[in-house]
């Protein structure tokens, strides 16, 4: 599930895997739900994958372009079901 860089996350550009603080651009999963652009699984940021706030979040939360806004609650544009 790593997207760009290190597998388990943390600070920096392109953190990859499940945990870590999730700061930075292109985080993979970000289980601690922090700020960042392009987070994979959770947290705030642009293009987050699974939940949390952000533009283009994948599974839930608030944001423009959520895939499944009703899955976790919240709202967004362009919901996929």
Curated annotation (Swiss-Prot):
One CC-aspect GO term: intermediate filament
UniProt keyword annotation of Repeat present: yes
Superkingdom to which the source organism belongs: Eukaryota
Xref: InterPro entries: KRTAP_type8/19/20/21/22 (IPR021743), KRTAP_type_19 (IPR051528)
Keywords from the named record: Keratin, Repeat
Keyword Repeat: yes
Entries under PANTHER family matching the protein: KERATIN-ASSOCIATED PROTEIN 19-3 (PTHR38140:SF9), KERATIN-ASSOCIATED PROTEIN 19-3-RELATED (PTHR38140)
Oligomer status and interactors: Interacts with hair keratins.
Family of the protein in this entry: Belongs to the KRTAP type 19 family.
Role summary: In the hair cortex, hair keratin intermediate filaments are embedded in an interfilamentous matrix, consisting of hair keratin-associated proteins (KRTAP), which are essential for the formation of a rigid and resistant hair shaft through their extensive disulfide bond cross-linking with abundant cysteine residues of hair keratins. The matrix proteins include the high-sulfur and high-glycine-tyrosine keratins.
Protein name: Keratin-associated protein 19-3
Organism: Homo sapiens (Human)
């Amino acid at each position: 599930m790593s997207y760009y860089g290190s597998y388990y996350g943390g600070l920096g550009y392109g953190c990859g895997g499940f945990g870590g603080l999730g700061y930075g651009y292109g985080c993979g999963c970000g289980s601690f739900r922090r700020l960042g652009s392009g987070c994979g699984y959770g947290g705030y940021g642009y293009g987050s994958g699974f939940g949390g706030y952000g533009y283009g979040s994948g599974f839930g939360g608030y944001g423009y372009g959520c895939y499944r806004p009703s899955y976790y609650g919240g709202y967004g544009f362009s919901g996929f079901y």
